[in-house]
């Protein structure tokens, strides 16, 4: 399970995100959207994420 402050990415690829909150099944992650030139957040199930190395 991930904790607040962890850096993660989708297993399928994508931007580096920081975990800003967690639950038993998911993590809310914040990332910078270059397309919109602003920060955004998304809730993703833990199984779809991996630690950024």
Which ranges hold each PLM region?
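Basic/aromatic-rich interaction segments and small domains that mediate binding to polyanionic partners
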Residues: 7, 11-53
